[in-house]
Amino acid sequence: MDNNVVLTMRGISMTFPGVKALDNVDFTLRKGEIHALMGENGAGKSTLIKCLTGINAFEAGEIRVDGIDGPVVNHSTLDAQKKGISTVYQEVNLCPNLSVAENLFIGREPKTKLGTIDWKTMVKKSQKIVDDLDMNIDVTQNLEEYSLALQQMIAIARAVDMDCKVLILDEPTSSLDDNEVEKLFKLMNQLKAKGVGIVFVTHFLEQVYAVCDRITVLRDGQLVGEYPIAELPRVKLVAAMMGKDFDDLAAIKSEESPVFTDDDILIDAEGM
């Protein structure tokens, strides 16, 4: 395995009843890169992620993770986390009625010599985690006190503190405004600089070109291709996702849109 590669998926195949969800799909993620996983609805993106995170058991292929000896054929979600694979979804999977510190350390709380939770240590460590990521928040406050964007960043901070090597962000910007998206991108670039490999799933093409280094395109459960961001113009990306001829899409794009004047009637309703 290349020293610069943190994750390799080879020949991943999976079938649902009557549907070939994934057909011999390859995917490679490098250390310290943001890699977009693109495709229309039903292309196989979610299924591939679920195979990677241990939710789905795939029928053929293998996964290799940096630092783990030998291939991973199938593993559980817990196994995936232990290998350094973490996912943050658009719907934050944390506990809103618990404090930020409790959410950061849930299931792995520091203990005193008596076996009780060491609250002081947990708060201190939690505050350092968020401070190191330039998140201006009070970890003693309940999670629900913060915006969805900050909640997602807290979920990312938890993953990072659990020594994640591969961070999957599945439609993280769907409910965020432009300012919140910029904050998320800043955090993503900080993690990139630390060597974390990030898989970014989104339908917003402008965001892909704003923050990603490479793009992998899936269509109908198959790999279309893997491209450096600078070598794949948007219209070619759309063509790859849709399975359309590039020249046809370019011709459509070049056609002039009709120009309407004040005298043109667009809608006319009478006697309603």
Walk through the language-model features, giving the residues of each:
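Glycine-rich phosphate-binding loops of nucleotide-dependent enzymes
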Residues: 2-272
